[in-house]
Amino acid sequence: MTLTFLLVVALCMLTTCHTENYRDSQKVSPVRSIGKTQFARSLRLSERYCVPKSGLCTIFQPGKCCSGWCLIYRCT
């Protein structure tokens, strides 16, 4: 892990990242307050399943984002 990645994780933990609108049938409630383990799990699930509700996705993962926002997944 790089220092930048750790910094992003630390900052993102201070925000909210909602994970919903999954492509498969799995239903997961929005994550409002996430810890390290939940963040890691949320990040992996987001890379695989999260799709934007509207707009463009920016920062690190173009085309992949959560319906809400955090520093890694952002819908604008």
Swiss-Prot record:
Disulfide feature: 50-66, 57-70, 65-75
GO CC entries: extracellular region
Domain-related comment: The presence of a 'disulfide through disulfide knot' structurally defines this protein as a knottin.
Protein origin, superkingdom: Eukaryota
First and last residue of the signal peptide: 1-19
InterPro entries: Conotoxin (IPR004214)
Recorded GO MF terms: ion channel inhibitor activity; toxin activity
Location in or out of the cell: Secreted
Protein's recorded name: Conotoxin Cl6.4
Record key words, sorted: Disulfide bond, Knottin, Neurotoxin, Secreted, Signal, Toxin
Propeptide: 20-47
Tissue-specific expression: Expressed by the venom duct.
A Pfam family assignment: Conotoxin
Location (main, coarse): secreted
